[in-house]
């Protein structure tokens, strides 16, 4: 297994090069959307990641699969970058490259990632309200929401921005009340 520090040393140059390419071509937002799509595909189909990480499988087979899966879904320049990762035997880091690219893109564009957990799915109006409040709170120029559901919250919302957690859930309120009564 490769340490996270070593992975960063391997991944950072590729993520930074993709940021530079996207910025230079005016495609940064397109690349970011494509990277989110790639990351989601990797999350939804772990077999794809296993196939790409398998050192026994030839690079040509991996590039053919990348072509089949992503050709009509992502920008051709980004697809070429995935093939380059394959040729350089770095394709096993694709998920990490996606995460690092998105981190750099958010930092470059002053966008914060807000991980929002609720008991039930949020409406578009609720999502917009959360975005506005997070923007006011962080002074960011934009907010990217990652919404998940956890029925154990009972109600309310938990918002995580970086290392900061804002717990406005019923479960959190009950826990704080229990601590006060104890």
Swiss-Prot record:
Belongs to the ATPase delta chain family. Keywords: ATP synthesis, CF(1), Hydrogen ion transport, Ion transport, Membrane, Thylakoid, Transport. InterPro entries: ATP_synth_OSCP/delta_N_sf, ATPase_OSCP/dsu. This is ATP synthase subunit delta. It comes from Synechococcus sp. (strain JA-2-3B'a(2-13)). The gene is atpH. GO terms for molecular function: proton-transporting ATP synthase activity, rotational mechanism. F-type ATPases have 2 components, F(1) - the catalytic core - and F(0) - the membrane proton channel. F(1) has five subunits: alpha(3), beta(3), gamma(1), delta(1), epsilon(1). CF(0) has four main subunits: a(1), b(1), b'(1) and c(10-14). The alpha and beta chains form an alternating ring which encloses part of the gamma chain. F(1) is attached to F(0) by a central stalk formed by the gamma and epsilon chains, while a peripheral stalk is formed by the delta, b and b' chains. It is found in: Cellular thylakoid membrane. The keyword Phosphoprotein does not apply.
